[in-house]
Amino acid sequence: MKKAFLISFTACMLSLLSYSQTRFNGLDMNMGNLYRLSDAKTRSISPENLTGEKGKAGMADPVDKDKQNVANASNAARDLGTGWKVNPYIRIKPGETFTMAVIDGPGAIQHIWMTPTGNWRFSIVRFYWDDETEPSIECPVGDFFGMGWGSYAPLVSAAVCVNPGSAFNCYWVMPFRKKCRITMENIDDQNSMTLYYQVDYTLTEVPADAGYFHAQFRRSNPDEPSIHAINDGIKGKGQYVGVYLAWGVHNNGWWGEGEIKFYIDGDSQFPTICGTGTEDYFCGSYDFDTNRKNQAGVAESNYTEFCTPYSGLHQVIRGDGHYNVMQRFGLYR
């Protein structure tokens, strides 16, 4: 039996009752509706405006250099003063949790950009909707953005983009009705982390049928008894919207014959949906191998990375025969 190291991050939208709304509320903006006007208000939270309030950005003063996360770049801005990138980032000490954003609704997050330093597996991002005391999203920041192996690889998709050199971008629309709270915890017990970030959101009416964004993080090491639960324990009406896998191989041979199965609404022995193989589920085929020819004209077997708007094999860590021995893969759909 093959053993594998497998990490998964999944996301879903849990919906409420449906409701018809004809007036455009400014949500779900795209190239096809940019001409439509609404009463939505655009706001953005960053270290330069930690509340997102109107007319309150860029107010950090270098004289506050001794206050944590108030004027972190005061030395670089010492000759420029207020209004000149005095606090573009925050620092999170070992074991500390920093509140990145608190937003009063109704509204929706439309885009998040961040570039965290340190060990991405040791940085835990959490999202709380409305009056929640337990988070709907709790995930290492690297896995949330498709970088579960802690090293950069280009990722270009409709929902998540990771750009040089470590710019994490998320375009999931995440509505809330009363409140949104986002935190980042540094569970590294030795090193502080530096975080540049921006949370772009809109304040507007939210349809009654809008769901709340949820995500589960799971890790199996090794994957025994060869069954890894990607999603489990979800109840109620909802919509499965995606998965990211960080897959490590411990043995020789092709690793991707595992079938993705969906057990829905009471399924027990047999699922409702069953795929034909791992690479097939991620919209590839035949081991992700294109048998490209080398300079001598001989076909060589090798993995081919790819990114598309909705699926991809964006990362292949092939090993160097030295300290990085195992092959590792990053896949999304």
Can you annotate each of these PLM segments?
Residues 1-4:
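Positively charged n-region of N-terminal signal peptides that target proteins for export
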Residues 21-333:
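Beta-strand-centric surfaces of beta-sandwich/beta-rich domains
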Residues 7-16:
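Bacterial N-terminal signal peptides
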